[in-house]
Regions:
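Short acidic/glycine-enriched loop/turn segments that link adjacent beta-strands
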Residues: 86-88, 136, 158-163
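Short, flexible, glycine-rich and Lys/Arg-enriched loop motifs at helix boundaries
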Residues: 130-140
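Conserved acetyl-CoA-binding loop-helix of GNAT-fold acetyltransferases
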Residues: 97, 103-116, 141, 145
């Protein structure tokens, strides 16, 4: 199955699907830059961000989309993948926005892109895992605003004192 490089959600925020090794490397470098996230990356996150963007090239069910700023630098990224059980539940593998580009609606538009992608892939829902750290409060609010429900909490998942929160949104099916 061949997928377009952009979807309607992607076009709205000028997001492009990673389609080349060079784009995958730029996305990896962006995700691995110090201070991008509110908390330190775990060793597993570092490994995933180093390898997963390139591994999704040519995959129908997994992908990364990125936005460039006016200077051409990557300023926002979202990664989406089918869950390992392959049951139609997708996961956000990464969502990151450069500090200077935050509070402009990019996160909302990228999550809308993810929801469009999942619906277009006949997925049943989208799972989002995020930190309980207070620096992630704007993300928690955005997820709630977009209809995600907090469905779980795992204490000390990332590091002692930093829990993981799971948010989920089912994909609505409309009869044709």
């Amino acid at each position: 199955m061949s997928l377009p490089k952009t979807s309607s959600g992607a076009a709205a925020c000028a997001a492009r699907r990673v389609a080349t090794r060079e784009e995958a490397q730029a996305v990896s470098a962006f995700l691995l830059q110090p201070g991008l996230f509110g908390t330190p990356l775990t060793p597993g996150e570092q490994d995933e961000f180093r390898t997963h963007p390139a591994a999704t090239l040519g995959c129908a069910d997994d992908g990364y989309w990125f936005v460039r700023d006016a200077d051409g630098a990557v300023c926002a990224v979202i990664g989406i993948r089918m869950n390992i059980e392959r049951t139609g539940i997708f996961e956000v593998s990464a969502l990151a926005i450069q500090a200077a580009s935050r509070r402009r609606g990019l996160g909302r538009r990228l999550l809308e892109l993810a929801l469009d992608f999942v619906a277009g892939s006949n997925g049943r829902g989208l799972l989002f895992e995020t930190s309980s750290d207070p620096s992630y409060a704007p993300m928690h609010q955005l997820l709630a605003d977009l209809g995600f429900k907090q469905v779980g909490r795992f204490p000390d998942f990332y590091y002692p004192g930093e829990d993981t929160l799971w948010y989920y949104r089912a994909i609505e099916r409309h009869p044709t």
